[in-house]
Amino acid sequence: MHSHTPTISVIEPRGLPVRALAYYRREVDEPCETRVTHQVHDTVGRLCEQRDPRLFTLMRSGTAVPPNLRTFQSLSGQHLCSDSVDAGWQLNLPGAGGQMLESWDQRGWHRRTEHDPLLRPVAVFEHFAEEPERCAERITWGSSSPDDALHNRCGQSVRHDDPVGSRMLPQYGMTGMVLAEVRHFLDSLEPPDWPVTEAERDPLLEPGDGSRSVWHFAASGEALSQTDAKGHTRYFTHDRAGQLHDIRLQRAGLSSVETLVSAIEYTASGQVLQELAGNGMRTLSSYDPTDGQLLSLANQAPDYVFLQNLSYRYDPVGNITAITDAALPIQHFANQRVEPVRSFIYDTLYQLIEATGWESAKPSLGPELPEWQAFGPPDSSRWCNYSETYHY
């Protein structure tokens, strides 16, 4: 099916791609259908128009159709306007320093951003259709005061008032990592219109000390612990390469520490080979040494019984063609031989066109609740084959 279906690129004298030709075939005995993606560049070589095969065919037939995406840029290369057949148009107004000042879109949404002398955003105003303009966000930056310098806040965001509340960042690390965060939520469900001063913003928040999270990092940047707003603390241990080795949890008010995951091993390229969960479940993985593709994924219970043992097969371009679960037996039900194998077939554009596999004889589909079942293990022999086809 994939014979004589190359991908061809057409390059103009400036070295810019102007067309990409793909050949579509769904069945082996079908003739190939040429699909052309069209691109247009301006005088200086910037992409300004794009057409997919559908709109390119209409254009070639003489029908006046707009491109899928038309973009306009300034002399300095900044994005000014885009017009999409799907998302509509969007207009941007940048400042002389490259900062975004205002933007409009086809839905009637207007967004305006104010900046400080260092071109950092300090306030974001939003206006939709006939609604009055409101301040949706305000950002406060650390100064060069002794207190900000003591907590490494100079030049960092120390308070961010957003549509859901306020995020306080009282302390940073030497390399810029957040060491503490306090989140205050709005006292009302209505979208906020943040005042200028902090004294006027604080009454809009829920009373109390807020939700505080704290992090600790090693000198090389790895996270050592995290304490959440409920007082639960997670501890992280790393190996010599700085990769995560285990995670432990200490619940609030308890002195005992429980293991969530441990004994994490990696390949030379950083892929996880195995890990041991806190309940004794072990996850084992293997990869192709030539390209790093996942070859198998297994879950082993504490009694060394495999609950899942998946193996994967791929086509030459990396699409999954089959998944086999060796932990499940071959079943026979309703005059069918049901093997624990899922297979996938693709067209010449590598779009999924057929999928086969196995499922429960009474699958629970739709939003309604599943049927009532008597207490006890389900009947594992009531499986049947299924097949799905896809058209684009």
Predicted regions and their residues:
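Beta-strand elements of repeat-based all-beta scaffolds
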Residues: 1-392
